[in-house]
Amino acid sequence: MEKKKILIIPLCAVLIALVAAVSVMLKRNSISKHSLIYADVNDNKLISYKISEKAEIRISFDGYSEYLLVGKYIGGEYCCVSKGENSLYDVLLIKNGNIEKTYQLSFCPDEIAATDDGIYCLTNGKIYRLSTADNTETLYKDNVYTHKYRLNMLITDKGDLVYLREENDGSVSLVLDCDGQETDVFTFNPDDTIDVGLNTDNRFLYKDKSGNYKTMAVSVYGGKQQKYGKSATFVQASSDGKLAVKCKRQVLGECSDVYIVDGKTGIAVSTHLVDLDIPYSVVVV
């Protein structure tokens, strides 16, 4: 009887390890089915980088040749800003690989994000809201902090706006805007804090200089600050809220590879892209 117990214990350990390995493999395969969408800043082309194939594919839509910027689109796959044949700036909402709707802007923003109700455009410290009902532009926020930050305006998977507000005393507040109702998430000294984006689970990630640049996380919908536990150069949640993009510096060659990461399990798949190859405005689909 004792011999049987001795044999069963190692067998159970092997089975547990096998199940864990299979689970990780399945998650990696699931992550690999996704693609990165971004605009090539060198020739203004729209690029889809397929993780499974480690290859770039150019995307084009009839009537458009220059693609300047991409952003998150709640309700579809992504949005992008393009210069049309009439030399105006068009916002294309992409769903299922096709243009769902088109809107016109009088300027090219620095950052863009879209919902079914409105399109948010950040430029020169101001956020403009483009109505999806009548295509009108209105000034929405005029005190946005942008200095030394890569991501200053974000959209949660619920379609709510998150942005950085500059305060009179020089501090900066992370603000959640739900249909015009603002809630201050937390306030920080911009000289000591570097933001890295909005992760899955609607957690805002940032690096604190006073804490040896450890990555911290705080939920924009309430909750205490906590250590994120993993290094990140920037983070952008995917349109389905399941995956995130992050950069991770490798020891060999001092090269920053871009990883697709499951935000809930930490499983990562390398894209073999370096972070300098893609801009901060990248969307996972």
Placement of each model-derived feature along the sequence:
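Flexible "stalk/tail and boundary" regions
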Residues: L93-N96, E100, A114-G118, R129-S131, ...
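Repeated scaffold domains used in trafficking and secretory/extracellular systems
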Residues: Y64-G75, S106-D116, T146-D157, P190-T200, ...
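A short beta-strand motif characteristic of beta-propeller blades
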Residues: A55-F61, N98-Q104, T136-N143, Q181-F188, ...
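An edge-strand/N-cap motif at the start of beta-rich repeat modules
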Residues: V22-D62
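N-terminal Sec-pathway targeting helices
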Residues: M1-L15
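Structural motif
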Residues: N42-S48, N86-L92, G125-R129, D169-V175, ...
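Intrinsically disordered, low-complexity segments enriched in Gly and acidic/Ser/Thr residues
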Residues: Y206-V261, G266, H272-L273, D277
